[in-house]
Amino acid sequence: MNEEPQVLYCDAWLMAIDKPAGMIVHGDGTGERTLTDYASDLLLAMGDGFAATDMQPLNRLDRNTTGVVLFSLDKQTQPAFDQMVIDRAFEKHYLALAEGKIDWNEKLIDKPIARDRHDSRKMRVGASGKPSQTRVKVLKRLKSRRGLPTRSYIDVELLTGRKHQIRVHLASEHHPLVGDDLYGTPRPCGLMLHAHSVSFTHPVTGEYIHIEAPCPWEP
């Protein structure tokens, strides 16, 4: 991991950071530096020790997924942000590169997701799972070139927030994400999945907020 996280937005109650590939959001017990550590150190450097102590991530991204991660900075307003997560009040869009040519232009993938009983690292589509909805729009179909196979550049809107949801849903459509080492085929480029934007009404100020993280790769 060479890139440093970048602050995209910050006020008294909320911070948004652009997470690079290779960094985890929360600690996993190994002592590895996390995005939460980075945000806490940044707040301490800004002289805001209370926020550095109180902060909580409002969303999480897999290690190799890049893009927007939100942090609540204030205990008093944390419940309001938590309720927004429950109410799905955050509109989240991802950019991704999927294997193969997707024939449809736009689709709502509505398939329940459960844990994979045969592999603890994975999730799967299954009737016993939790309701899960992903809206996918094809932005561009990329023809094979220079030895690369046909791929589809897509905009993905998360309507629910299950673990590995985008990866599982696209794999279930026979279009796994490029570079997905769990549900597809590993590639040198890594996982082509980027949390591009989040939009919401600020629970304190009432202001409409739209935050974007520039995509680190070209389709």
Where in the sequence are the language-model features?
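Well-ordered beta-strand positions in beta-sheet-rich domains
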Residues: 93-95, 106, 110, 133-135, ...
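RNA pseudouridine synthases
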Residues: 1-122, 127, 140-143, 147-148, ...
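Long C-terminal interaction/binding lobes of large macromolecular proteins
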Residues: 136, 154
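Pseudouridine synthases involved in rRNA/tRNA modification
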Residues: 1-14, 20-26, 130, 144-151, ...
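A structural micro-motif recognizing beta-strand termini
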Residues: 99, 155-159
